[in-house]
Amino acid sequence: MVLKVKMGDIGVGKSPDSIETLLGSCVAIILYDRGKKIGGLAHIMLPKSRESDSKSPGKYADTAVPELLERLVKLGARRDKLVAKIAGGAAMFKANTNSIDVGKKNIDASKDELKKVGLRVSSEDTGGESGRTVVLSLKDGNVTIRKGNEVKNI
């Protein structure tokens, strides 16, 4: 089964399923426990939450990371065995050099939030100017990135 994660949402699952999302300036925060074959993906839209929006923890880097961790541990993942990867953060709307680069801010915030919980990004496919499709295979933890005709694994 393929679980499709929408903007601002979080998806978790077990082998043999996969988790997929489409990204522009948003970032996918991906965590995977290779031994248990359990993983998850948060599709964050913005770096920092506002207290008034506590109903959407997957929308922001600062709330998505702890929520994703909690859901994975409840599913049986071992926190000390989780591998972190990120993808996305494209500069989709580069009008001028003074424009706010939401993609870059999302990348930086994702790394910062993972670091706060003791996780280091093991690999990434971030930045650029085009969107991408991200697929996490829960069988083996491979993350496949598709950008146009280009396909690669991280």
From Swiss-Prot:
Reactions catalysed, as given in the entry: L-glutaminyl-[protein] + H2O = L-glutamyl-[protein] + NH4(+)
> Mind telling me what this protein is named?
Probable chemoreceptor glutamine deamidase CheD
UniProt keywords, alphabetically: Chemotaxis, Hydrolase
Q: Which residues form a coiled coil?
A: none
Q: What CDD domains does its record include? A: CheD
Query: How far does the signal peptide extend, from start to end residue?
Result: none
The EC number(s) given in the record are 3.5.1.44
Family in the record: Belongs to the CheD family.
User: Which Pfam families does UniProt cross-reference here?
Assistant: CheD
Q: Which domain of life is it from?
A: Archaea
First-tier enzyme category under EC:
hydrolase
Q: In UniProt terms, what function does this protein have?
A: Probably deamidates glutamine residues to glutamate on methyl-accepting chemotaxis receptors (MCPs), playing an important role in chemotaxis.
> What Gene Ontology terms for biological process does this UniProt record contain?
chemotaxis
As one GO molecular function, the record gives:
protein-glutamine glutaminase activity
Mind telling me which Gene3D superfamilies this protein's record contains?
3.30.1330.200
